[in-house]
Each structure stands twice: as structure tokens, then as C-alpha cells.
Amino acid sequence: MLGPILCDQLCGKGKFTAETAEANPDVLLIAVERCREAMVVAMEKAKAMGLKNVYYIDMDVEKIEEIFAGEEIDRLFINFPDPWPRKKNAKRRLTYRTFLDKYCRVIKLGGEIHYKTDNAPLFEFSVEEFAACGLEVKNLTRNLHENGIVGIMTGYEEKFHALGTPINRCEVVCKPFVLPKEEKKTAEDAE
């Protein structure tokens, strides 16, 4: 019998993916990465660890609905995505409402998105997007490792933690929602 299905979006070199799969042998972990060089490193790591419950997909995140059926995933991890800091690129952020809509279509009702970033402005933007979409945010922290290391860390996370950079984290409960209407663009948005 197939256990819970977890998806690690943009798994990078696979430290988090491999350690999560090793700690949870009863789950099926699907790792998505569009950079083939990073994915090869991740795959070699999983093979060296003898992991049988992790699979890798070379895919752009935008195509998630082409790979997964409706309400198939139990948990989706988004760890340290590109912040796309310019306002005009907000739609490229992996926590923008159109991405959230796609995620909530493939994540089971009541399933979760676990989200981590070192980028405070991106985190605030993301929390606002979650709220605008009517999604429940829980276990929100702006300094995850303040009192010691919590959970499995990504490679980026280890580096940022060593530098003393606070790690922002939250969990988002997925449910059906209607995409909020797009706001009218202003000259300031083009920055």
C-alpha cells in the first residue's frame, strides 16, 4: 500500500530530500528540480544512501498539474525559492496566487504546504498571498532556529543559519479557493 505522497519543489542538490526520505521510509517523496546538474547530485546522494522511496522529476514548477492528479499530494515543500525581488516579477514567485491555485489543486484537501525562506520581504509577500487566497497559515515563525535547530535543514538553510540569518517558516493548509482578482498595475509596480 502506498503511503503519503510528499513533493519537494526545487529540491536542489537534494540534502533535504534525501534526509526527509530516510527519516520517513513509509512515504513516497517526489523531488522536482529543473536544473539537471543539481538533480544529478541529488539522485546520486539518494542512491548512495540506498533510498527506495524517492523519485526525481526534471520539470518546471508551472507544470505541476501535468504530473500530479487532483488531490494526490499530502504535503508540498517549498524551500528557499528565488525571491524575484522586483515588483514586476511578483508573478514568478512560487508563492504567488496562481501557483497557490495549482498547488491546492494537486494537494489533498487539508494537505499542507511547508514553506521556508531566509528572505524576509518574500516571506511577508507570501503570508499576504496566503491570506488573500483564504488559506490557513499555522506554525508561523520568523526565526525558526532561534532556540536550536528544528527539523531537517536544507543546504542553503545550513549556510544561512551559520551566518546567523533568521529562517522564516510556516505551514499552509490547502483548501479550494477562488483566485483573488488581479490588482490594477501602477507605475510603482514596474520597479
Where are the language model's segments positioned?
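A short glycine-rich, Lys/Arg-flanked "PGG" loop and its adjoining helix->strand segment in the class I
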Residues: 95-109
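Conserved S-adenosyl-L-methionine
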Residues: 10
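Class I S-adenosyl-L-methionine
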Residues: 126-128, 133-191
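Short alpha-helix immediately C-terminal to the canonical SAM-binding loop
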Residues: 39-40, 123
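S-adenosyl-L-methionine
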Residues: 1-7, 15-22, 44-70
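Conserved beta-strand signature within the Rossmann-like core of class I S-adenosyl-L-methionine
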Residues: 110-117
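Conserved SAM/SAH-binding beta-strand->alpha-helix loop
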Residues: 35
